[in-house]
From Swiss-Prot:
The keyword Disulfide bond applies. Potent and highly selective inhibitor of alpha-1/beta-1 (ITGA1/ITGB1) integrin binding to collagen I and IV. Is about 25-fold more potent than obtustatin inhibiting the binding of this integrin to collagen IV. Belongs to the disintegrin family. Short disintegrin subfamily. It comes from the Eukaryota. A motif (Cell attachment site) lies at residues 21-23. It comes from Daboia palaestinae. Its main location: secreted. Keywords: Cell adhesion impairing toxin, Disulfide bond, Secreted, Toxin. This is Disintegrin viperistatin. It is found in: Secreted.
Amino acid sequence: CTTGPCCRQCKLKPAGTTCWKTSRTSHYCTGKSCDCPVYQG
């Protein structure tokens, strides 16, 4: 990957790394994508 909240220095961040946080919930990197997964609840 080159850009995205789950990408660092052209490498994927580890699964479980926080990529987006609000006062109510957090979203975590999957380790398989440079994008932050969107909660579908």
